Amino acid sequence: MGNCCGTPATAEEGGKRRRRGKQKKANPFTVAYNRAPSSAGAAAGRPGLMVLRDPTGRDLGARYELGGELGRGEFGITYLCTEAETGDRYACKSISKRKLRTPVDVEDVRREVEIMRHMPSHPNIVSLRAAYEDEDNVHLVMELCEGGELFDRIVARGHYTERAAAAVTRTIVEVVQMCHRHGVMHRDLKPENFLYANKKDSSPLKAIDFGLSVFFRPGERFTEIVGSPYYMAPEVLKRHYGPEVDVWSAGVILYILLCGVPPFWAETEQGVAQAIIRSVVDFKREPWPRVSEPAKDLVKRMLDPNPMTRLTAEQVLEHPWLHDSKKMPDIPLGDAVRARLQQFAAMNKLKKKALKVIAEHLSAEEAADIKDMFDKMDVSKNGQLTFEDFKAGIRKLGNQMPDSDLKILMDAADIDKNGILDYQEFVAVSIHVRKIGNDEHIQKAFSYFDQNKSGYIEIEELREALVDEIDGNDEDIINSIIRDVDTDKDGKISYDEFAVMMKAGTDWRKASRQYSRQRFSNLSLKLQKDGSISDDTQ
């Protein structure tokens, strides 16, 4: 239910988890959603509302001093917090009771505190120091984690060796094992919910954010769709699941650690859901041919679509790949992680070719606008843009990318790799950044590829269209494009699939953070109605 990391978060990111909690299915034993708030869940912070059953106290200031803001969300603010007597530093998440508008909001906070108190001390689970409640706020004093997210270390490091991936996976699964032994299902395991205690390489990894966690009894099944889409088990979409979902999510994280992208990826929520239901794991693209067979075997067993035969946390920890992790290869698996987390760089050659086609069909006004921008950036008036020229121009477009991302973007646009952008290279990247491509442009680009007018881009048409883009018509690249874009896996690309590719980016991390729980819940119902997923309970 919150991030106790010392790295500031945006309001959008900080508030996302709480918004999800507001949309949970109503408990039949509590007040229904469509009724006016009762005293148990007073909407506007009504005086007398008590959220916690057993708060540490009422006066936070008597023992702790709040410092600078670490993060802000819809329901509250996380501050640096210092214990007056010892000088020890913590994170304090102050949740405004005025913003707990429904009984479900109140129950979310209450349950998170109870779960964190219930869990025994563990080196890889963030600890709750104290929980105060006054007239206006609930204050959760927690262990301060200043080492950043697991995800960010993946990106910064650029790749993981198998040995490093095994060490991280062992930690994550040990957390799952501890939760399950104490009757807690996390339900939202993902790289963002694991923080490092400090910035040292030897820093312990800590599980955080128990806001979607729930107590469970052996054999109990749940129906509420929660979690983040790329880490969601198929039985969650089928609305019949138990603690096995945490092992699935840990398996998704392992897959990402080894190759840099989620195993079930698409550019639409429906595509993601369908990929999860199909549960076909790709071990063909790089760097998988270089990954050991024991590692791939563990991924397969953790991503078993049948929860009844999926490995338990205990079985995962006994798997040879983890049991003998120090014997695993310590050779880097390449730069796949960085390469695949880069939006424009990860854009496949089909999309780049399509952007060129669109550029040729721009209206005079659109073309003039881009030419004018290029001329303004080209301060030396030599028809070429340096990185500094490009950076200044992108800022003028209103895109505040960090320099590191801009460098990646420019490198991807710089087709001839001479370190500068000419006008044609600039046109393609401008269309991407400014999202100029409209439906008419996309239709023209699709028609360019669909030479036989069948309504599909077929493999032969793809080969012919990209003959100038690919040295020797590399079959691996052709097959990779089909795998990436062909979401219904019929071996060809429909207009809808092509349009989705053109309109969306490939930044799956951002998509994960912008996830709408209600939309995914509605999507589950839609897929059940159209027969994409069955109502079986396995």
Swiss-Prot record:
- What is the topology of this protein in the membrane according to its UniProt annotation? Lipid-anchor
Record bears the keyword Heme: no
Residues of the active site are: D188
InterPro entries registered for this protein in UniProt = CDPK_Ser/Thr_kinases, EF-hand-dom_pair, EF_Hand_1_Ca_BS, EF_hand_dom, Kinase-like_dom_sf, Prot_kinase_dom, Protein_kinase_ATP_BS, Ser/Thr_kinase_AS
Q: Which GO terms describe its cellular component?
A: cytoplasm; nucleus; plasma membrane
Q: Name one GO molecular function term.
A: calmodulin binding
- Describe what upregulates or represses it: By UV-C.
Q: What is this protein called?
A: Calcium-dependent protein kinase 8
Source organism per entry reads: Oryza sativa subsp. japonica (Rice)
Point out the gene that encodes the protein: CPK8
